[in-house]
Amino acid sequence: MLLLPRPANYHLNCQKLYQFLVASQKNCDRNCSQIVSISLEIDSIDPLALLEKLARPHQLNFYFENKSKGEAIAAIDAVAQLQLAGANRFHLTQKFIRSCLKETDIFDSSNHTFAKPYFFCSFSFFSEATADYPFPVATVFLPRWQIARQGDRCVLVANLSIEADTNIDVFIQQLWRKIHEITSIEQPENEGNHFQREFSQVDVSSIDRFKQAVIDCSELIYEQQLSKVVLAHAIDVQANTNFNLFKCLNRLRQMHPDCYVFSTHNGKGQNFIGASPERLISIRDRQLFTDALAGSISRGKTTAEDTVLANQLLQSEKERHEHRVVIDFITQSLQELGIAPQLLSPRLRRLANIQHLWTPIQAKVPIDVHPLEIVAALHPTPAVGGVSRQLACKKIRTYEKFERGLYAAPLGWVNHQGDSEFIVGIRSALIDGDRARLYAGAGIVAGSNPDREIAEVRLKLQALLKALI
């Protein structure tokens, strides 16, 4: 059965689509092409299931889900892409998006939030890589196929290239054939995702080295050279079989429903995945939301113990100071862009195995400020970098003997009208066949204790490992 628009609208849509494509083709010069973005509402389906069926090892793809909001989006293959490095990567990405949009005609029969062109982006923590790392410093692509679900509504977006000599009838036939293939994919039965594999794990650098780094940074903080620095630790996991990306993602969204579950594939066999509690920015209709998320403690085994731990977190001078540093940085960075932030009441962000101090921040974005300008201003926040930013990042390079890559870095999307959502790629792992590198970090401020900091890191790593193994 062809799961396309309802029969009453099918002929009308085909007729309108044909007229749209003919008009778009007239915009093509003899030696150039035009991108057409075609959106169509389809029956509800799990975007992760489609990603599993349609993803190919040699193609870029991206997955982004916020289960608590009932939103999931899968982007598959690229009709246009850019990969680059350097300090001006955010600006060049912004130019690329604007250039693509100038060459894109839009056909939307769905009136869906996730219709029309969306550009998917990943940026590494540092603007230049110092070690061999499988992902570029910056990647942005317009997907050839995009499937998004919001609540019980689902939209398919096809971004395709059309040329001056394209046969429109054949083009439409091929499009409907592909749509039929996509919408005919059967969603798998829930087979259960409890799987155990044999594995070994090793610290990328020693625990003693991490503890010494905490001591050294604490001395710099005492000397007032730094206010905060975030130190990461990584473990390498070797399994006896290849990791099943889609089962891992499914486990992550089941285990961490209050987090952003994400995955990006580089087209060369490696995936970067995770479940991040930290939103960098979310913009809808020029309304900005961001999070100050810093200061943490474990969850209790009982309700009473959980309450005791929460009160300890709320009353901890060290944790509150760490949180305040992040708030001050975000508000100042937004003000420098001409954005007036409003702080909502502070609260706790309770996750499966950890709880954080959390202050939501919102603001109205001026019409002349692009989302990537905000991303560039905020990254890295003190929640993943430190204060002062430049010295903290220098110390991170000194003490961490591995490439952060996409860890603690911005991943997300920007659409055609300036809506955007980016998360911070923490609680994450680099997957390569039967190998995985898992990352987690801890914020070092005045009063930090090396044993407590490594315990916090291990808590975060074990939660991620549980989803993979």
Model-derived segments and spans:
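Non-catalytic accessory segments adjacent to catalytic cores
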Residues: L2, P7, R98-K228, A234, ...
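An N-terminal JmjN-like helical accessory module and its immediate linker preceding a catalytic domain
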Residues: M1-A87
